[in-house]
Amino acid sequence: MRALARSLDAAPRPVDVFFRDDDAGWEDARLLELIARFAEHGLPLDLAVIPAELNEGLAARLRDSHAGLHQHGYAHTNHQHEGRKCEFGPARDKAAQREDIARGRDRLREVLGDRLDPFFTPPWNRCTRDTAENLVDLGFRLLSREHKAEPFGLLPELPVHLDLARLTPEELDERFAGHVADGGPVGVMFHHGVMEPDDMARASELLALLATHASVRARKMRELCP
């Protein structure tokens, strides 16, 4: 993490950083391990929770955690017949999308109560303008996708910039450094379900640096929501 450390050392002001882990509801043991790693370093974590996959036992654990909690689609199911995977893509009409979003929101409200933030992360970080319009109509306050996605301009968006699962240590170092130089905020995305022990160790190395550097201001997503 030498490039990142140098970039943080050179930052003229603190850089906001947030952490979003997707697919809560799958691979509970790995999820709880990642939550524990963040707790060890005293860093905030936001979880994108799959409504149809959340069981009562995990819901209780999440309510008792310090993690931010928000909605991750409905069932994380691909509805596209061709092209890239998408749960809320052009293959579905606006009414069908709205039904799933509302059903998922109601399910999470039932089991998570006031711990649920009115934010939405679409599975695979993809959705349509119809999705965004539905989110506005249903009272959501924030949409989170990847930073390369063109904003819809309908509600605030807080994108992630770095996908820990897809980057080599060298790529993560260089790209994180570049986003720090741009001034932030910087969103770091995790997928606990694919994290092996080596990945957890690499995550801990990154968290240790970010937790102790004076130029890092670690935030929950709700703190960055307008």
Question: Where are the regions a protein language model picked out?
Answer:
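Short glycine-enriched loops at secondary-structure junctions
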Residues: 24, 73-77
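Acidic-and-aromatic substrate-binding clefts and catalytic sites of carbohydrate-active enzymes
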Residues: 23-29, 48-59, 121-130, 164-170, ...
